[in-house]
């Protein structure tokens, strides 16, 4: 049986990236929470 996680960089960024987070109100809340906590990487887009 095939495993469920088949990683794709493009999909990962499209779903969890900075631009994706900014497009929804809740996504912006996620970024605000991560900024408040002092995360060095806000989204997967920053992992470069």
Swiss-Prot record:
Keyword check for Signal: no
InterPro entries (alphabetical): Ribosomal_bL34, Ribosomal_bL34_CS
GO annotation, cellular component aspect: ribonucleoprotein complex; ribosome
Keywords associated with the record: Ribonucleoprotein, Ribosomal protein
A Pfam family this chain is assigned to: Ribosomal_L34
Disulphide connectivity of cysteines: none
UniProt GO MF annotations: structural constituent of ribosome
GO biological process: translation
Keyword Chloroplast: no
Family stated for the protein in its record: Belongs to the bacterial ribosomal protein bL34 family.
Name used for this protein in its record: Large ribosomal subunit protein bL34
Species annotation: Metamycoplasma arthritidis (strain 158L3-1) (Mycoplasma arthritidis)
Lineage, opening ranks: Bacteria, Bacillati, Mycoplasmatota, Mycoplasmoidales, Metamycoplasmataceae
């Amino acid at each position: 049986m095939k495993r469920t996680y088949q990683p794709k960089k493009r999909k990962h960024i499209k779903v969890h990236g900075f631009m994706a987070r900014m497009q929804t109100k809740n996504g912006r809340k996620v970024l605000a929470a991560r900024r408040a906590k002092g995360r060095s990487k806000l989204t997967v887009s920053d992992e470069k």
